Swiss-Prot record:
Subunit (UniProt): Component of the Integrator complex, composed of core subunits INTS1, INTS2, INTS3, INTS4, INTS5, INTS6, INTS7, INTS8, INTS9/RC74, INTS10, INTS11/CPSF3L, INTS12, INTS13, INTS14 and INTS15. The core complex associates with protein phosphatase 2A subunits PPP2CA and PPP2R1A, to form the Integrator-PP2A (INTAC) complex. Component of the SOSS complex, composed of SOSS-B (SOSS-B1/NABP2 or SOSS-B2/NABP1), SOSS-A/INTS3 and SOSS-C/INIP. SOSS complexes containing SOSS-B1/NABP2 are more abundant than complexes containing SOSS-B2/NABP1.
Gene Ontology BP annotations: DNA damage response; DNA repair; double-strand break repair via homologous recombination; mitotic G2/M transition checkpoint; regulation of transcription elongation by RNA polymerase II; response to ionizing radiation; RNA polymerase II transcription initiation surveillance; snRNA processing
Keywords for the protein's UniProt record, in alphabetical order: Acetylation, Cytoplasm, DNA damage, DNA repair, Nucleus, Phosphoprotein
Species, as recorded: Homo sapiens (Human)
Residues that bear Phosphoserine: S502, S537, S995
Biased composition (Acidic residues): 1008-1022
Compartmental location: Nucleus; Cytoplasm
Disulfide bridge partners, by residue number: none
UniProt protein name: Integrator complex subunit 3
InterPro entries: HEAT_Ints3_C (IPR056518), INTS3 (IPR045334), INTS3_N (IPR019333)
Amino acid sequence: MELQKGKGAAAAAAASGAAGGGGGGAGAGAPGGGRLLLSTSLDAKDELEERLERCMSIVTSMTAGVSEREANDALNAYVCKGLPQHEEICLGLFTLILTEPAQAQKCYRDLALVSRDGMNIVLNKINQILMEKYLKLQDTCRTQLVWLVRELVKSGVLGADGVCMTFMKQIAGGGDVTAKNIWLAESVLDILTEQREWVLKSSILIAMAVYTYLRLIVDHHGTAQLQALRQKEVDFCISLLRERFMECLMIGRDLVRLLQNVARIPEFELLWKDIIHNPQALSPQFTGILQLLQSRTSRKFLACRLTPDMETKLLFMTSRVRFGQQKRYQDWFQRQYLSTPDSQSLRCDLIRYICGVVHPSNEVLSSDILPRWAIIGWLLTTCTSNVAASNAKLALFYDWLFFSPDKDSIMNIEPAILVMHHSMKPHPAITATLLDFMCRIIPNFYPPLEGHVRQGVFSSLNHIVEKRVLAHLAPLFDNPKLDKELRAMLREKFPEFCSSPSPPVEVKIEEPVSMEMDNHMSDKDESCYDNAEAAFSDDEEDLNSKGKKREFRFHPIKETVVEEPVDITPYLDQLDESLRDKVLQLQKGSDTEAQCEVMQEIVDQVLEEDFDSEQLSVLASCLQELFKAHFRGEVLPEEITEESLEESVGKPLYLIFRNLCQMQEDNSSFSLLLDLLSELYQKQPKIGYHLLYYLRASKAAAGKMNLYESFAQATQLGDLHTCLMMDMKACQEDDVRLLCHLTPSIYTEFPDETLRSGELLNMIVAVIDSAQLQELVCHVMMGNLVMFRKDSVLNILIQSLDWETFEQYCAWQLFLAHNIPLETIIPILQHLKYKEHPEALSCLLLQLRREKPSEEMVKMVLSRPCHPDDQFTTSILRHWCMKHDELLAEHIKSLLIKNNSLPRKRQSLRSSSSKLAQLTLEQILEHLDNLRLNLTNTKQNFFSQTPILQALQHVQASCDEAHKMKFSDLFSLAEEYEDSSTKPPKSRRKAALSSPRSRKNATQPPNAEEESGSSSASEEEDTKPKPTKRKRKGSSAVGSDSD
């Protein structure tokens, strides 16, 4: 299992005849297929592989038989011709790296030289291969892919963290200890361990790595090889948890669940002792285990432990398979992923994923699609291990234990109650065991927090009734099918829910005709599939994909996707004869080209002078029915090229858009087509983002994005902002890839609508994954995208404080990609509470430590109220002490003098506009005293600097006795300075030896500022404080006053 590391690719190739290295025991001798992907003689050639091989041949033809310098010149000259040529060369070199290990080092060097986009093309292609093609990738290519990622990380390429997270997603859990899977787990771990300093720069990567390897530790036991890997994983996780606990805190309550599974490992046993008894040892901002348990885990973490293939199959079942027809799919899933004894632990990951990530739209809920509770019921009934069954039940109820209606979603707790409700008739034992577990988990989960758990479960049940998931719980809790002891326990624990005699009325339409959970179809249904074998496909694409939030790679059974004939008869009689004939032609048209011709004739007829505009509504109804498939299919092509984009906008419906682009805006025909689109929009709101896509993708619409504004004004909404936000929301719900594709042009073309609030930003960060985040960051840094501007960035970041943890981190990453001075958003500090806003505080703290402190920054930091658990101000002041002691001393001196010289009456009568930024003398002294205590056992001599001592003297001379008493230790430093200043000049010269300059080379203790990330602040609304431009007083003037 020895892997290629660093420059080992070329060396390994030379030693083994370009075999490419281990790959978990696999070699280059693949059993058939192309250079990249495994395939059989029956498989069609993969489009992606064809394209990459084409690009590789272009590079090879330019570099074969010439010197290295000539090859470099040829590549650079070709790249300079345009973006398509740049992409071809980058992908060609990338493919050579994967397929020719002997040339890997040279090709990587060439790639670094010719890349004009910070390797963005290569990073995107790696992500695509990992998500879609990894299972079919040749072993040599897998090995080289790991080598390439290691090189990208070593080079510090922006976005490599996203690729590492995608790689981690490919590591299968659930007891998969096959050679290839273990090789991958160890390879990624080696990269993260070797490049530790790079890992520590990304909070998201730290959290994702800890979550991934904490989960994998449980599976790695038995052989000496697995034990060795397990120890490396333990050391890795423990080091990050102990050194960067605040970053790991973003995982939320599922971190506790994973830590419980490894609690008996000695290193984690010690960690648990600190979490329970000494939380401050992990981070000054960590108040205890309750803080973790009350934090909801983002869906990004829950999704990361399912491989892309597993996730695709599960999403397919929850969005396409009809209830009653799921048995074949479940049998396949069982054989593929749940057939071994060790794989039982995977059920927890699946249940957490279904509860926390799969949140069906109302359209799916109201259909006959397989509901979530049925899949969970199947996972519970087929579980063969008692330990796995207990863990699966805990996974199902986990969000109940500390449920808060303000922070948690009803969708996370809904499956558990519906499993119990629907199982009562066919499987009363399942309902009984779940109800029993719900009662017993309250006192047993963690006895010191029993009250909180009881409140969480009670809040969950209350919320379920309030939202009418079930109208009453009494028929469930007091059902005669339950034994008397269980019913008595339920009455004792939950008397509030046992009183109603009414039967339960389920409002959510998740209940199908049959409630039986053994998932057997009737004979009649079964006969439909006698000749059809259900099969998941790893490599084929579902061309009829409805694409709800995900891109699926699966062919369903043919019978399930047959479209029912469209019935437009009710509308035809209301149309003129000639128009009716054309609509019927359109319905009968078999190919796109013919339909486009008919569609153009319909548009021409609409534009005729004698056309009756009252028929527009009827025509719109016909078109909406006829083109339903357009709105269900994929909009954005998989491979984005000029040709594929132009082909994608060749749909008949888009003829209306094309005609619109060719007209003058003051033309009556233009208004008529807008009216037709407005009628269509009323009947099918998705038309809005289809128009946006057309204006973005079509060459005919170049520079015509302003047409969307005319369209928005023509709709019943009549408002550009409202219309744009509704259309982007519809796009977000249907197709995240398209949302990301549209984002740069939407922000560029409609800056006033997008940049003035965080509405669109929130839509984006709520659904993107780490790869898409990295892509957006690259767009920002390349100047293609501006998501923040100075006049509104502060308000948007304040709005983001109410978002989910991962969404906030995404927002901050995107902000930091912009070149906006930190001082613009420093007033956000006044809104940040140390318990409620750890995400923003962590990001702000890490960014402040990179800045030279300005007086305004220091003022804002010192303006925060003092609290014993709030270490934010002390953390950043300590860091600035170490790096910029003289500058910080001058700023603090200036602020002390200003606040001391202001009359008390004036301070209290400040206008409300500056109330948030108000800084009091007592606040400054309290923070300085905390800093003094923090520096007590260090060799840092910050408080012996002349400006600080002069300012303290100045304050001491005029403050009252209460303050002198309260800050006596702080003022005693000034008294010592005063004593030394009255001595002869010779003594003064000696004292000068301890001046800041002479202390510059003093040994400084290691900093702990990176662990600080929480603080407190005022709840009042923000108003920007005006920057002060007063001249700073010279130290000599203040010194002479004191003397």
